[in-house]
Swiss-Prot record:
It is found in: Cytoplasm. ATP binds at residues 5-13, 22, 130-135, 154. GO terms for biological process: cobalamin biosynthetic process; porphyrin-containing compound biosynthetic process. Signal peptide: none annotated. Its main location: cytoplasm. This is Corrinoid adenosyltransferase.
Length: 193
């Protein structure tokens, strides 16, 4: 099988159920998800073989598969919607966010992306996720999409934030606090809401 088909040489690409321009919001959406998936591969390469990160490594690999599902779900434009991404994937992210938030030091101020190299990579993944989310929101204003994709991306950016903080904590590196930040987050044990 050849990697090239020449069918996209005039600026269009194939979807499940049709063709569209390569600069369409749909292609921009799943293209940004593909970019994110590639970047996670870089973070995985950085984590590879480092002790104490086996859970995160396994999760990132699972997320790569789920992002592939997101891209596939966004490429469906037929009446028959054989979506792959499930609400269980969203719930899993929520569980991990809660666990990582509990493990990391208490957050009191805004933080800057940074700390360890791997945490910095996860912060970049977070920002790419937010861009993908913005593209999907723009797409859903004009076309039907699998709405679980949007919920998943929204949780995923929070997951990357929490995971980056845990990577720093496990590495013995503190978060980089924004120097002009006041205390903006309340004590976890505070009864005030």
């Amino acid at each position: 099988m050849k990697l090239y088909t020449k069918t996209g040489d005039k600026g269009q690409t194939g979807l499940v159920g049709g063709r569209t321009d390569k600069d369409s919001l749909r292609v921009e959406s799943y293209g940004t998800i593909d970019e994110l998936n590639s970047f996670i591969g870089l973070a995985l390469a950085e984590l590879s073989g480092q002790p104490g990160f086996e859970d995160l490594t396994a999760e990132l690999l699972t997320i790569q598969h789920e992002l592939f599902d997101c891209g596939g779900d966004l490429a469906i434009v037929t009446e028959r919607k054989d979506y792959k991404l499930t609400e269980e994937s969203v719930s899993f992210l929520e569980t991990r966010i809660d666990a990582y938030t509990a493990e990391a030091p208490e957050l009191k101020k805004f933080i800057l992306p940074g700390g360890s190299k791997c945490a910095s990579l996860l912060h970049i993944a977070r920002t790419i996720t937010r861009r993908a989310e913005r593209r999907v929101v723009a797409l859903m204003k004009s076309e039907e999409i699998h709405e679980t994709v949007l919920r998943y991306l929204n949780r995923l950016s929070d997951y990357f934030f929490a995971a980056a903080r845990v990577v720093n904590a496990r590495s013995g590196i503190g978060d980089v606090e924004y120097e002009r930040s006041a205390i903006v987050f309340r004590d976890r044990n505070s009864s005030e809401s």
